[in-house]
UniProtKB/Swiss-Prot annotation:
The organism of origin for this protein: Xanthomonas oryzae pv. oryzae (strain MAFF 311018)
Binding residue positions for ATP: G9, V10, S11, G12, G13, V14, D15, S16, M35, G123
Gene responsible for this protein: mnmA
Region (Interaction with tRNA): 145-147, 307-308
The protein's name in its UniProt record: tRNA-specific 2-thiouridylase MnmA
EC number of the protein: 2.8.1.13
The entry's keywords: ATP-binding, Cytoplasm, Disulfide bond, Nucleotide-binding, RNA-binding, Transferase, tRNA processing, tRNA-binding
Record site: Interaction with tRNA: H124, Q340
Stretch list, region Interaction with target base in tRNA: 94-96
Disulfide bonds: C99-C195
Biological classification of the source: Bacteria, Pseudomonadati, Pseudomonadota, Gammaproteobacteria, Lysobacterales
Catalytic activity: S-sulfanyl-L-cysteinyl-[protein] + uridine(34) in tRNA + AH2 + ATP = 2-thiouridine(34) in tRNA + L-cysteinyl-[protein] + A + AMP + diphosphate + H(+)
Main location: cytoplasm
UniProt key word tRNA-binding: yes
Length: 378
C-alpha cells in the first residue's frame, strides 16, 4: 500500500464522497479516514455505524484505502465539556466551531500526517487561497451551503495543509456528480443539527447532563406568567417549547424569549417577535481569532454574521488592547446571543471571529450588570 499524499475525511455523506472523487480523478495517492467523535450511548440514535458503512463503500468504489480513528475522548474533553459548561452558564455555544478547531483540524490532521500524508481534504463548502504570503479562508461558491462561518477559527498552518475540493461547487452540481460517478451516497440526506444529538429531543438530551431546575417565566414588567424547566434550555429569540398557555388579559399570540437571569433562574418573555428588548447595535466579544494571524487594523469596517446563514451586516470593528473585539452595527440586530460566534468578512474572505460575550440589548445588559459602553466606537 502506497503512502497517501492526501487523506480525505470521509464522513459517509455525499459532500465528502465527491471531495474524495475529485481528488481520485487527479491520480495522486489518497486514502479515506473516518472519524468517530461520539461514543454510542445506547440510545439507538447514533448513526455512526451507518455512516461508517457508507464511508467504507465510497472508498471501495474509488479504490482507496479506508482508515478509522476514534476521537470520542478528544471530542468529550475538547468540545463537549465546554458545551455543557456554556449551557450551565446560560450561554448558547456553537460546538461545530470548536469541533473543527479541536478535532477535525487538529487530531484528524495529526492522524493523517501519521499516515504519511502531506495534506488533508474535507467536504466543507469553503475555499482556500494564498495571497500576500498568507493563506486566506474564502466562502464556498454555494452561498446557501457556505461553511466558512464554522471554520473561522482555523489558522495558517491548518489552511496550508488543507484542501476543500468541493468549495467551488453548487450543491445541485455536486449531487449530479455523485450520481453520475456512481457514488453510493448520491441520494443520502444531508445531516442537520448538532452531531452528538442527532434526531433526539434537545431538552431531553441536555437534561441527562444538566438536571432540570424549575423557575419562573416572567413578562418584561416582572409579572409571573408560567414556569420553565431550566433557563439553560432556552436561547434568546426562541419561540418553541415555552409551553405558555392562555394568559389572562393577554392576547393569544406567541411568546418569545427576551432575557435570561441565570442567577435567579428567571426567564423573561415578550409577545413582540421584534421586541426592543431583543435589539442590539453593539456587542463585546472574547477569544478573538484572526485567520491570517492579525486583524486588518485596530479599527476597520467589514460585515459580520452573529449566526449561521445570517445575511451580512455592515459594522465597525474596534480591537481592544487585550485583543478582544467590540462591534458596532449600522442597524439594530435581533437576538444576538452570548456564546454564539461572531464571524467577520471582507467580501468573500473570512477574516476571523470571536465568541459573543455581551450586548447592549436593554434587558440582557441589565441582567448581566454589564459595564459595556456604546461610546467606545463613534
Amino acid at each position: 500500500m502506497s503512502t497517501p499524499h492526501i487523506v480525505v475525511g470521509v464522513s459517509g455523506g455525499v459532500d465528502s464522497s465527491v471531495a474524495a472523487w475529485k481528488l481520485a480523478q487527479q491520480g495522486e495517492p489518497i486514502a479515506g479516514l473516518f472519524m468517530q467523535n461520539w461514543a454510542d450511548d445506547g440510545s439507538g440514535d447514533c448513526r455512526a455505524e451507518d455512516d461508517r458503512r457508507d464511508a467504507v463503500a465510497v472508498c471501495g468504489v474509488l479504490g482507496m484505502p479506508f482508515h478509522f480513528r476514534d476521537f470520542s475522548g478528544e471530542y468529550w474533553s475538547g468540545v463537549f465539556e465546554h458545551f455543557l459548561a456554556e449551557y450551565a452558564a446560560g450561554r448558547t455555544p456553537n460546538p461545530d466551531v470548536l469541533c473543527n478547531r479541536e478535532v477535525k483540524f487538529k487530531h484528524f490532521l495529526d492522524a493523517a500526517q501519521a499516515l504519511g500524508a502531506e495534506r488533508i481534504a474535507t467536504g466543507h463548502y469553503a475555499q482556500v487561497a494564498h495571497r500576500g504570503r498568507r493563506w486566506r479562508l474564502l466562502r464556498g461558491a454555494d452561498r446557501d451551503k457556505d461553511q466558512s462561518y464554522f471554520l473561522h477559527q482555523l489558522g495558517q498552518s491548518q489552511l496550508a495543509a488543507t484542501l476543500f475540493p468541493i468549495g467551488d461547487l453548487e450543491k445541485s452540481t455536486l449531487r449530479r456528480i455523485a450520481r453520475d460517478a456512481g457514488l453510493p451516497t448520491h441520494a443520502k440526506k444531508d445531516s442537520t443539527g448538532i452531531c452528538f444529538i442527532g434526531e433526539r429531543d434537545f431538552r431531553e438530551f441536555l437534561g441527562r447532563y444538566l438536571p432540570a431546575r424549575t423557575g419562573e417565566i416572567r413578562d418584561p414588567q416582572g409579572q409571573r406568567i408560567a414556569e420553565h424547566p431550566g433557563v439553560f434550555y432556552f436561547t434568546l429569540g426562541q419561540r418553541e417549547g415555552l409551553n405558555i398557555g392562555g394568559v389572562r388579559g393577554r392576547a393569544a399570540a406567541p411568546w418569545y424569549v427576551v432575557g435570561k437571569d441565570v442567577a435567579s433562574n428567571v426567564l423573561y418573555v415578550d409577545q413582540d417577535r421584534d421586541s426592543p428588548l431583543l435589539q442590539s447595535r453593539w456587542l463585546q466579544s472574547e477569544q478573538a481569532h484572526w485567520v491570517t494571524g492579525a486583524p486588518p487594523a485596530r479599527r476597520f469596517s467589514c460585515t459580520a454574521q452573529t449566526r449561521y446563514r445570517q445575511p451580512d451586516e455592515p459594522c465597525t470593528v474596534d480591537v481592544q488592547d487585550d485583543g478582544s473585539v467590540q462591534v458596532h452595527f449600522e442597524r439594530p440586530q435581533r437576538a444576538v446571543t452570548p456564546g454564539q460566534s461572531l464571524v467577520l468578512y471582507d467580501g468573500k474572505e473570512c477574516l476571523g471571529g470571536a465568541v459573543i460575550a455581551a450586548t447592549d440589548a436593554p434587558l440582557e445588559r441589565q441582567l448581566a450588570g454589564s459595564s459595556f459602553s456604546s461610546e467606545v466606537v463613534a
